[in-house]
Amino acid sequence: TGSSNLKKFAAYLAVLVLFSCRPLVTTFDDIQDAVTFTSASKTDEPTSVDNLKVMTWNIRFGAARIPWFGDSCGDRVLMTESDVIANMDSIVSFINTELPDILLIQEIDMSSKRSAYMNQVQYILDNTYFNYGAYASMWDAEIIPSAGLGKVNVGNAILSRWQITDAERIQLPLRTDQDDLTQYFYLRRNILKAKIALPITE
């Protein structure tokens, strides 16, 4: 029954809390350092810039057109590794065609079960000409019970040809129309702010 299943899940959560070294859900300070990344193989940084091309893209955690349950357009919850790699390679190909200097990304996954635990920030860095990245999570949970979603870490990222410094995650207000348990497991939206060392002489 539903009541029995709820009790079993509550007991499962209690065991996780007792024996886990980290909380089920990561909470954040109002302002804290973002996570930074570097490409495994850096490319030469442009030493001058006449026109700066900035692109923004919600990559939907590499799901492409997969009918995902969370968008109310299907019933898929988890992708296979081959799904993720194929979709991420398409994203990488588009980036390498458009050649933005700075890329602002929304809904990029880091070690989430639904996207085969891929570090998508590092994957894009290592397969494009971008040298530096900064990441701010908006949803970092060891387990999300909905539909077997499991471990989730998704957020915003900035990728750049040039050095990124002073990257900060700025917490936005949480929703106030949810009960405490729902709010605990829900998104923690944020602003990702950073400085980029553009080759501009004053």
What residue spans do the PLM features occupy?
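Bacterial Sec-dependent N-terminal signal peptides
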Residues: 1-33
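Active-site catalytic loop in hydrolytic enzyme cores
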Residues: 162-201
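N-terminal, active-site-proximal structural segment of metallo-dependent hydrolase catalytic domains
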Residues: 20-153
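Residue-level detector of beta-strand structural context in well-folded domains
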Residues: 43-45, 157, 192-194
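Conserved beta strand-loop-helix elements of the APE1-like EEP
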Residues: 126-129, 151-167, 196-199
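Internal, well-ordered alpha-helical segments in soluble enzyme and binding-protein domains
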Residues: 120, 155, 188-192
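Extracytoplasmic ligand-binding site segments that recognize negatively charged/polar headgroups
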Residues: 148-157, 183-187
